[in-house]
Amino acid sequence: MDAESLLLALELASGSGQGLSPDRRASLLTSLMLVKRDYRFDRVLFWGRILGLVADYYIAQGVSEDQLAPRKTLYSLNCMEWSLLPPATKEMETQTSVVKGRFMGDPSHEYEHTELQKVNEGEKVFEEEVVVQIKEETRLVSVIDQIDKAVAVIPRGALFKTPFGPINVNRTFEGLSLSEAKKLSSYFHFREPVELKNKTLLEKAELDPSLDFMDSLEHDIPKGSWSVQMERGNALVVLRSLLWPGLTFYHAPRTKNYGYIYVGTGEKNLDLPFML
């Protein structure tokens, strides 16, 4: 959700229980504007909160002029002092995939994991137990990146692609119509497309290249991993991810108000295919 309209955005997303105390809201409003100025971001998004056992991580993201360029991620424990996180890598994801359970809320906390490594002694090969330490900060980076790739959402038409390449905010976007807002096909993943290149030429011919340049939610696997609900007498559409419980996307049809927020433990619902 855009930091500049934070209070309205939190109000619209509050149906899922994603609220913040008045002092946290005031701190965020001020500190995110300073983050935008100091890091020279085009936009700052309040991404959400990852709940820890000792403390919670408040997450913000900086967006450059090209809206699909990699976003810079920052975290804070008090909503005032922000620290920049390193970019996520495949190695981080592999390393942290073995860590299960809740976050602690301490970036310097280290998880211990025992794994078997092959050791050569002459012609003989032995398997030796090695204790690997994984920092919570590394796990935080990896989980945020996974959530972004899987469930960050944007409505169709909110961004447009110029013939020269850069992707910009569509200043003429006036919101989806009520009938369009109820369809999953009207929402895209807010990331570089992955499935788009697999479409046939006939399917691509039906798309508008300036608007349909991202992957649609309607083809997400497993099918049924999104819940779409109309609230406030059809004045608000709310999408909730069942794969990453805690992710809520909201959009008020026929207005420019949209955004998403994640408030959860940072754990994926791996049982979802068996629950549907």
Swiss-Prot record:
Main location class: cytoplasm
GO BP term, pick one: motile cilium assembly
GO CC field: 9+2 motile cilium; axoneme; kinocilium; radial spoke head; sperm flagellum
Superkingdom of this protein's organism: Eukaryota
Keywords: Cell projection, Cilium, Cilium biogenesis/degradation, Cytoplasm, Cytoskeleton, Flagellum
InterPro entries given in the database record: RSP9
Localization per record: Cytoplasm, Cytoskeleton, Cilium axoneme; Cytoplasm, Cytoskeleton, Flagellum axoneme; Cell projection, Kinocilium
Disulfide bridge map: none
Transmembrane domains' residue ranges: none
Sequence similarity: Belongs to the flagellar radial spoke RSP9 family.
PANTHER family: MITOCHONDRIAL RIBOSOMAL PROTEIN S18, RADIAL SPOKE HEAD PROTEIN 9 HOMOLOG
Function: Functions as part of axonemal radial spoke complexes that play an important part in the motility of sperm and cilia. Essential for both the radial spoke head assembly and the central pair microtubule stability in ependymal motile cilia. Required for motility of olfactory and neural cilia and for the structural integrity of ciliary axonemes in both 9+0 and 9+2 motile cilia.
Oligomeric and partner information: Component of the axonemal radial spoke 1 (RS1) and 2 (RS2) complexes, at least composed of spoke head proteins RSPH1, RSPH3, RSPH9 and the cilia-specific component RSPH4A or sperm-specific component RSPH6A, spoke stalk proteins RSPH14, DNAJB13, DYDC1, ROPN1L and NME5, and the RS1 complex-specific anchor protein IQUB. Interacts with IQUB. Interacts with RSPH3B. Interacts with RSPH4A. Interacts with RSPH6A. Interacts with CFAP61. Interacts with LRRC23.
Name of the protein in its database record: Radial spoke head protein 9 homolog
Native source species: Bos taurus (Bovine)
Native organism taxonomy: Eukaryota, Metazoa, Chordata, Craniata, Vertebrata
